[in-house]
A protein has these predicted regions:
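Hydrophobic (often cysteine-bearing) scaffold residues that line and stabilize catalytic clefts
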Residues: 40-51, 91, 95, 114, ...
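Short acidic/polar inter-strand loop motif in beta-rich domains
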Residues: 309-320
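Zinc-dependent metallopeptidase catalytic helix centered on the HExxH motif
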Residues: 83-141, 199-200
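Hydrophobic helix-coil surface modules that form long, contiguous segments used
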Residues: 1-95, 124-127
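Beta-strand-rich binding/interaction modules
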Residues: 228-229, 242-245, 249-309
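Second-shell loop/turn segments in exported
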Residues: 34-42, 85, 111-112, 169-172, ...
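Amphipathic alpha-helical substructures
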Residues: 165, 170-257
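Acidic/His/Gly-enriched intrinsically disordered linker/tail segments
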Residues: 115, 119-185, 189-190, 207
Length: 327
């Protein structure tokens, strides 16, 4: 039994196997079919508890009286308040579907109008969890791969209503992959703790309400003290692309150290602050100019100039982000 439930489902079978556990005082129920060996021996119970614990650390306390995780017949996953149906026992899928308890279950966006608000958010949280808990960096491949897709051009913006997407492949990119990458860029721009503070405020202020994009933007602005209208407009409401490039770079002796001059160009209509790294020293370029030149001093002779060294931008061509300094 639960209250403030906006949609529901059920699944029945006389053959289900059952395991149970607790997160705090919240019962976790796991149902799976005979022969689903990867689901038993407490494995999925433990992964479910781990996912719920982490998500509470991002948003706040889970408000429902229980959570059920069952093995669905098909692959993938489906989410409902207090119930997720997972096509497999993997931690990543479990985290994604559990994330929907918050992003869509408790914070109820309209999936026809703003699919990215829950699917993109859940995908973002899945990658953040993998980074935070498992020490992996899923973002690097995501940003590089999406940058290549961006270079080919996407037909519509992320904020396009689901029924207006031209095909299912585009829907997958714009509801899941690209908004996940955009939210990662935003987290890196604001800082992880500011992002977390904003999501906690999102939950505190809008739990069990219908939410829209502006609700998310406003709490992140409040948490950061920064106007984010430019960011949301640029990345969610246009198809603008971004490509930073090293136009030229040279280095020379400067007293006891080395002075390196770097000229950077920007093509495409999008803009983000850019980190330039030379010999371990970093400078952030905040201007929106098409061409910028920066001088960076290092103690040792640097080997190369690298733009966006942490791979946090949706850059359409990473091949021009690095230039060796000969000599």
């Amino acid at each position: 039994y639960g209250e403030r439930i906006h949609h529901f489902a059920w699944s029945t079978s006389p053959d289900y196997r059952y395991e149970a556990g607790l997160h705090r005082d919240i019962p976790i129920h796991v149902l799976f079919r005979p022969g689903d060996l990867d689901w038993d021996l407490g494995a999925v119970v433990a992964r479910s508890a781990r996912a719920l614990e982490w998500l509470e650390g991002v948003f706040g306390p889970y408000p429902y009286p229980q959570l059920t995780n069952l093995h669905r017949i098909e692959g993938g996953g489906t989410e409902f308040p207090m119930l997720v149906m997972d096509g497999g026992p993997g931690q990543g899928l479990i985290l994604h579907e559990f994330a929907h308890q918050y992003a869509h279950g408790i914070l109820g966006n309209n999936e026809w109008k703003d699919a990215w608000l829950d699917e993109g958010m859940a995908s973002f949280l899945g990658n953040w969890f993998a980074e935070d808990v498992h020490g992996v960096e899923p973002w690097r491949g995501t940003m590089t791969g999406l940058g290549r897709v961006e270079a080919q051009g996407l037909p519509v913006p992320v904020a396009t209503p689901s029924h207006e997407m031209p095909d299912y492949g585009t829907y997958g990119l714009l509801a899941y992959s690209k908004p996940s990458a955009i939210l990662f860029m935003l987290r890196e721009h604001l800082g992880a703790e500011t992002m977390r503070r904003g999501l906690q405020l999102y939950y505190e202020r809008h739990a069990f309400q219908h939410v829209v994009e502006d609700d998310l933007r406003q709490v992140l602005e409040e948490a950061s003290g920064e106007d984010l209208g430019w960011f949301f407009q640029q990345w969610f409401h246009t198809t603008a692309t971004l490509d930073y490039a090293v136009a030229s770079a040279s280095t020379e002796r400067d007293g006891d150290g080395w002075s390196t001059s770097v000229t950077v160009t920007r093509t495409g209509e999008a803009w983000m602050p850019l980190t330039v790294e030379v010999g371990g020293e970093r400078v952030v370029l905040e201007e929106r100019a098409r061409t910028q030149t920066v001088e960076i001093t290092t103690a040792e002779r640097p080997e190369a100039v690298v733009l966006d060294p942490d791979v946090v931008l949706l850059d359409t061509d990473r091949g021009n982000n690095r230039q060796a300094l000969g000599g």
